[in-house]
Amino acid sequence: MIKPKLKTKSPNFSSGPTKKPDSWSLNGLDKSLLGRYHRSKYISDYVDEIFLDLKNILNIPSNYKVLLSPGSCSGAIQSVIWSLLGKRRITSIIYDFWGEKWSNEIKKLKYKQEIRSSLNGNMPILNEICPSNDIFFVWTGTSTGMSIDNISWIPNNQTGIVVSDITSSVFMNRIEWEKLDAAVFSWQKAIGSESQHGIIVLSPKALDRLKENKKKLVPNIIDLNNREKIINTPSLLCFSDFRFCLSWYKNKGGLNWANKKCKDNRLVLDKWVESNDYLENFAKEKKYRALSTSYFLFKNKVRKKEIEKVFSFLEYENIAYDIRSYRKAPLGIRIWTGPTILKKDLN
């Protein structure tokens, strides 16, 4: 293989954890938290300040509650499934492998579920959802490079609660909070922060459901009725990192800046794919192509061994790390296009 004369400044194109902001360094983090008791007033106030910043930056309604979960987004979504769901039939929208995973978790609990699934690059039917059902969906699926686009399809007279995994869309897409009752995400995607902590955002309707389910048997670590902000000991270094990345995001210009940055990044890859004859987008309709992750299939049949050699070469030469397709998805290329990625590195 021919070594390129020009290389990327950063070869980090993983879809999570993602590349750090360029200005990030360990020395830039506040270390005054380390060694402090996590339930002390000092730390409690620090967490409150971060959550308030988060709500302001993301325009989360003031009457929505923000909670911390262990186990990143996975822990957050399990907390929601166990604590909030089960009373009503659930319409699950599945177009990526994470949505399928969460649907299988719902099945294990024997909740009533209407499954609308498509894993072939097409979006399942979104309209005519029973208003009394709960709704469950992933906003952006990095395993398929697809996104729900918007949630205008959710009925205005929806009496069931709406649950969404927004990990790969928050900070990049315009989230319609008023239509979401339980939204979960982690820190390690759009803003390049550290993993292992999940955020849960609950609407007043979700909080009412939580009260209704108060007597439900739920494992302590994921019981949302059993916490105010945090349930176990968080990493205070990760909190400091999160605050740094939030500040970086805000100073760059927030959502308007990030949304444009992602669109510009994706456009670079779209033009690249259109100009070659060996790759194509997995997502069939352009409007469902994700802002944060692009996923491409090979048009012609290729041998996995040969493609693995290419991936190894790109990694060895520090050109591109971690661009293999998701492990359950068809063989292809998956590249993160979030706001920490530089356009010139994609070029």
What spans do the regions from the language model cover?
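Active-site C-terminal subdomain of aminotransferase-like
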Residues: 188-272
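Conserved C-terminal alpha-helix-loop-beta "cap" of PLP-dependent enzymes
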Residues: 274, 278-344
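Conserved N-terminal alpha-helix of the aminotransferase class I/II PLP-enzyme fold
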Residues: 27-79, 83, 95-105
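N-terminal "arm"/small-domain region of PLP-dependent enzymes with the aminotransferase-like
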Residues: 1-41
